[in-house]
Amino acid sequence: MYWISPNNYQVLAQETETDIEKKVLYSSKTKQIIKDNPNLITIHSHPDSFPPSIEDFNSNYENKYGLGIVITHSGIVYMYSSQEHIEPVYYKLKVDEYYLEGYNESESQIKALEYCMSHFDIYFKEVTCDARRGNGYVLRR
């Protein structure tokens, strides 16, 4: 995982080694950087190619990050942010509800996030770029 300054786009911290699968362990140095720098941009990968997890949203809120970016191993990129905590049990129930309707796991998570986005102060979007139209996302310095 990387923490990037929104002011100059410099990497302020990184945690790329972990003994726990699907978990990022923050060093004391990283914790201090997060505390001293609100609105950081975070970037991390999801090897299972799922969208941002509810834990990603809650971490974004609790750590006052400005924007989160998830890059999946299938090549899909998501951006997200959160202005409030969502109970993981609630989110899991919504995912299960969509799964029982016949959606696969990834689709169920996306549907649950869309539902939460309409009922809570969170935001997420798949990042796309249409090169023919010149539409894309560019960070400007």
Task: Describe each model-derived feature in a short phrase.
Residues 16-64, 73:
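Short HxH-centered metal-ligating active-site micro-motif
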